[in-house]
């Protein structure tokens, strides 16, 4: 008997996508914890489900993060803790491709929240930054705000989970249209496609702000001591290459 099996990544029709954004506490002694999450489930044609919740991070939100997101301790004081919404996140994202702008930041933060609960959360990932670089080349910046401004996508409530998720969804739909034959989506969903695994303890804006020009960069350890110095023609691309999955 011969089985004619087509892996899901060879046919992107019928796939559901969970487009996600999380806001977090940023770096801190107790780690990077989620303060807000938004999920839009997309069937490749339209949004079919929405989910949003503030989350009590069980730690103080730094002032700098409150200035960035507008989320403060009072807003999340009565919000559910992550373990109270974990079942919702699992159910909503089951059988979906996990999509985000700089996907590994959001994915790793959520993955760590589940790991702390002893649950092995795993989903296939798709990054709208990588897709945009491939399908809309040559832009000066691929941060969500500047990218949306460049191509005319409205972005309201910047640095709030639902605002960023709605903008990412509009970007995602544009990318789907640009990839009419789905060759790029297929190649990025193919097992073995390299993705940068961003450290979950760093705010994703740090990576958004990296310049795409020639220069020198360096890494510091937790004591602020320089542990690595590099040079690159494209600083952002080179820095991200340090975090590519090796598998």
Q: Which residues fall in each region the model found?
A:
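Residues immediately flanking
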Residues: 22, 102, 128, 222, ...
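A generic structural signal for short hydrophobic patches within well-formed alpha-helices
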Residues: 110, 131-132, 239
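Conserved anionic group-binding/transfer micro-motifs
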Residues: 99, 164, 168, 230
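A positively charged, amphipathic N-terminal helix/segment that binds anionic biomolecules
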Residues: 176-247
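Short, glycine/acidic-enriched loop or turn micro-motifs at the edges of active sites
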Residues: 24-26, 105, 130, 167, ...
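Conserved non-catalytic scaffold segment of RNase H-like nuclease domains
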Residues: 2-123, 137-141, 145-159
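Extended, hydrophobic interaction surfaces within ordered domains
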Residues: 1-4, 72, 127, 131-190
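DnaQ-like (DEDDh/DEDDy) 3′-5′ exonuclease domain used for proofreading
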Residues: 1-33, 163, 167, 171-206
């Amino acid at each position: 008997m011969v089985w004619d099996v087509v892996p899901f990544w060879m046919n992107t029709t019928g796939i559901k996508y969970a487009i996600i954004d999380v806001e977090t506490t940023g770096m801190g002694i107790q780690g990077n914890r989620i303060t807000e999450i938004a999920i839009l489930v997309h069937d490749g044609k339209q949004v079919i489900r929405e989910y949003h919740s503030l989350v009590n991070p069980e730690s103080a939100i730094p002032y700098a993060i409150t200035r960035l997101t507008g989320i403060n301790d009072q807003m999340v004081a009565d919000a559910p803790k992550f373990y109270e919404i974990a079942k919702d996140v699992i159910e909503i994202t089951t059988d979906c491709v996990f999509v985000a702008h700089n996907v590994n930041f959001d994915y790793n933060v959520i993955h760590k929240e589940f790991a702390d609960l002893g649950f092995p959360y795993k989903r296939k990932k798709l990054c709208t930054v990588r897709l945009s670089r491939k399908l809309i080349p040559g832009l000066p910046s691929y941060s969500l705000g500047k990218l949306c401004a460049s191509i005319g996508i409205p972005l309201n409530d910047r640095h709030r989970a639902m605002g960023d998720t709605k903008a990412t969804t509009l970007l995602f739909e544009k990318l789907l249209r640009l990839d009419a034959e789905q060759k790029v989506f297929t190649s990025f969903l193919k097992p073995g496609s390299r993705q940068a695994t961003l450290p979950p303890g760093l705010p994703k804006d740090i990576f958004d702000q990296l310049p795409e020009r020639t220069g020198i960069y360096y890494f510091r350890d937790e004591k602020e001591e320089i542990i690595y110095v590099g040079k690159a023609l494209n600083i952002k691309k080179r820095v991200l290459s340090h975090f590519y999955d090796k598998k």
